[in-house]
Amino acid sequence: MSLLSRRKFIGHAGKTALAGSVIFATGPQQAGKNMKNVFIHHVYFWLKNAGSAADQDKLAEGLQKLSGVKTIRQYHIGKPAATSRDVIDTSYALSWLVVFDNDADQASYQTDPIHLKFVEDYAHLWQKVIVYDSVDR
């Protein structure tokens, strides 16, 4: 085997081993894993310019920055899925799902300078915002 071929082989083998370790590091997938002891904050945004891809991109950029608040455990920025059933509302432009460890972390987020700056810089883009907060029952 030539030196170049050997290097390619070693490089590919290393990447394959790394990919395998990532899969096993996450552990086996569990169906229906329940999130416990968390505070869910789900925000839906309707844009003033509903069809504007530029405004949607700008808001997504702002949400990405907002996701840097230290008390946020996890987040997801999404758009309506291409599903069609009577119970599904796809009229919003973007949603932002946030997981906090507790109510105190969510309360801290409300006054965090990053959150206040987000509202100041991006509020002109939306016409309506609805928030659904939930905790364990």
Language model segments and positions:
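Short amphipathic alpha-helical segments
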Residues: G51-I77, P113-A123
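C-terminal segment of N-terminal export signals and the immediately downstream linker at the start
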Residues: F24-A54
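Surface-exposed, polar helix/loop patches in the mature regions of secreted/periplasmic/lumenal proteins
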Residues: V99-D136
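N-terminal secretory signal peptides and thylakoid transit peptides that target proteins
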Residues: M1-L18
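Short, glycine- and small/hydrophobic-rich beta-strand elements in well-ordered beta-sheets
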Residues: F24-A31, Q64-A93, H124, V131-D136
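Short, well-ordered beta-strand segments in beta-rich or mixed alpha/beta enzyme
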Residues: V38-L47, G78, R85-Q110
